[in-house]
Structure formats: structure tokens, C-alpha cells
Amino acid sequence: MVILFIKKEAIIFGFKNLSPILDSKDMADSTKVEEMNRYANDLVSELNSSFVLVEAPDAVMRFNDITPNGFGVLSYMVSQAFQPDYLICSIPFELAVPEMVKALSKYFEIRLGSPISAALASNIVVDSAENLQTHVMSSLFVPMNYSMLKLSQEPCADQIPIFSVINENDPRLFMHVTNLLAIHLDRR
């Protein structure tokens, strides 16, 4: 397995780092995509890996026109370098409703080449008042008992499971990812 992260600190854990390519001022964006693809293919060959796990380098979509948050440009570049088989996405619990997850999945499938395989809902929400006043993305935490209650009432969104990252004793996300990887490895 090859794990590629954007943060330089990831190398402490043995993960590979994409920062030198993404942060390069000497390469055009198209060259960065080619370099990331070459780098990953070299790692897969060298390590005889069956799959590559890649962290999205920025928000995968723009929040609004007031507060720029990366617009998903870097994530789009990464998705061009590595055709994703699966996308596990983190969302605020207030968006963890089947209709929204289904709409996001369709959007990501068009934009990034992969639908959402699973959604992780957290008790973080966007602080819209702060966002409008300062034009800076900020968030706040909703009490866990409130968000857990809301999440427990939401079903899956068209076969897209919605997991709570708040409940640390819930093994379902790990089991879901393990099943996805088993299916992926069986296809090879």
C-alpha cells in the first residue's frame, strides 16, 4: 500500500509526501499532474503496491463566493494524476442527509471521476456569521449529544453509508473501508 499525504509531517509515519510537487513554483499545473502520476507509479512499482491512498490537498469544492477556500483546484489536480476508485468524504453533520450526500456524490463523480463511497459526518459546522463578517472560513463545534442524536436518525443515501466520526467505538467505517479494499483487490 502507498499512502500519499500533502502535509510534510506525514513522512514521520512512513507516508509519502506530495508537497514538493504541489508547492513547486517551477512547474506548470499540467506538469505537476504528470509528476504526481509518475511519482505514484514509481512508488507502486517499487513497493509492489496493490492500491494508493491519497489525501485531498484542499477542500474539494468551493464553500461560497464570499470566502475562498481553495476551490478544490488542488484536489482536482490530484484526481487527474490518480484516477480515484473510491472517495470518502467528510461533511458537517447538518449536511449529512441522504439528499445532500446523493447530490454531492453526483457532483464529485462528474468533477473528480468518483462518486462518494462513504460520508463521515462530524459535529463541526461552518460559522456563517463569522464567514460573512470576516470573509474567513471558520467553524464551531455543536454539542456532541445534539449532533449524535441527529445523525442516528439519518439513513443511508442511495447505498452511500453515512458514518459518525464522533462515535469512536463504532467499527462500521473501518469495516466498510476494509470491504471496499477487498473488492478492489479481487478485481485485480
List the model feature ranges, each with a label.
Residues 1-188:
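Flexible phosphate-sensing "switch/lid" loops adjacent to ATP/NTP-binding sites
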